[in-house]
């Protein structure tokens, strides 16, 4: 009898928070959502809530990977491949999410209209980022087929691309978080979704702050060609907030190598 009562008490204790997590944000008894809305939300969260932020994180903080003997080992393309794959996949998921909702949204409230405007802005930003990447210009440099190139010479075209690409990308990620929160509220999503997304975004911000403080946001130019002033781009100011440059000695000291 005592064991039965203890089991019942444990079940009740576990059922209460679980029921709270499964309940909609409004506290309604039931939650109903159209299939197209559910798939729209899943694809947008996959794209703008997961893949695109991770791709941006890889590009900002992993141009030199742990254990890489920079500047003896230059141009590690792991970050580039990760960034490109996740950005293309994220924009594809975004586009499919837009297609799922095309012509089906009927919300006329202020929150729904704001969500729609932000959503369209994010789609335009995503497509613009892909187009900008394709039009970023040539690479150049000692290891390329041609020495002269937009990136190696840091031409005005390349500088403009970097300024727009970096600022638009991070602004879009911040707006995506707001848009996703609005979507959860409009759909009256289960509370567990809000909890999971809150934990995810908190972890993302914490990782960003930690990596930034560690000085891992390294100039792309230096990561590719090294710190020598013989390379023209190293004689120009860095592009972007919080971007670091290192001498060979400073990087070795930071990495704990002699």
List each model region and its residues:
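Membrane-embedded alpha-helical bundles that constitute the cytochrome b-like, heme-associated redox core
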Residues: 2-258
């Amino acid at each position: 009898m005592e064991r039965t009562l203890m089991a019942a008490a444990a079940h009740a204790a576990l059922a209460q928070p679980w029921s709270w997590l499964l309940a909609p944000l409004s506290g309604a008894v039931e939650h109903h959502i159209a299939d197209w809305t559910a798939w729209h939300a899943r694809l947008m969260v996959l794209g703008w809530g997961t893949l695109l932020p991770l791709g941006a994180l890889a590009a900002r903080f992993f141009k030199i990977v742990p254990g890489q003997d920079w500047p003896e080992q230059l141009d590690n393309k792991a970050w580039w491949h990760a960034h490109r794959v996740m950005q293309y996949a994220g924009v594809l998921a975004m586009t499919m999410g837009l297609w799922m909702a095309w012509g089906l949204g009927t919300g006329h409230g202020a929150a729904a209209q704001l969500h729609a405007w932000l959503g369209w802005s994010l789609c335009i930003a995503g497509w613009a980022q892909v187009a900008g990447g394709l039009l970023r210009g040539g690479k150049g440099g000692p290891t390329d087929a041609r020495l002269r190139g937009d990136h190696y010479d840091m031409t005005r075209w390349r500088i403009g691309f970097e300024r727009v690409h970096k600022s638009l990308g991070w602004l879009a990620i911040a707006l995506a978080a707001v848009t996703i929160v609005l979507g959860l509220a409009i759909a009256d999503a289960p509370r567990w979704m809000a909890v999971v997304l809150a934990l995810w975004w908190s972890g993302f911000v914490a990782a960003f702050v930690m990596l930034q403080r560690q000085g891992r946001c390294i100039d792309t130019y230096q990561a590719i060609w090294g710190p020598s002033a013989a390379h023209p781009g190293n004689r120009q100011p860095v592009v972007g907030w919080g971007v670091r440059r290192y001498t060979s000695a400073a990087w070795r000291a930071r990495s704990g190598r002699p």
